[in-house]
């Protein structure tokens, strides 16, 4: 996994059982940079899901519509 993918997983584990908003994850991951493409987080989440599915962890990261992500 890439550094950013690991940071996303770390953040989700740190807040396990809670819904993590996209904004909170983006702020943590990219340290409040002025501009981050809206699609950047989605791409990283998709890549993490694909890698986890390859080892049998399907649906490990759940999307909560209009709220964010949770484990």
Regions found by a protein language model. Name each.
Residues 48:
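Signature for phosphate-centric chemistry
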Residues 1-44, 52-57, 65:
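Positively charged, aromatic-enriched patches within helix-turn-helix-type DNA-binding elements
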């Amino acid at each position: 996994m890439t550094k950013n993918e690991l940071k996303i997983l770390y953040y989700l584990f740190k807040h396990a059982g809670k819904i993590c908003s996209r904004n909170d994850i983006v702020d943590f991951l990219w340290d409040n940079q002025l501009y981050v493409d809206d699609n950047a987080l989605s791409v990283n989440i998709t890549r993490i899901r694909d890698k986890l599915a390859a080892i049998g962890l399907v649906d490990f990261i759940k999307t909560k519509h209009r709220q964010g992500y949770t484990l």
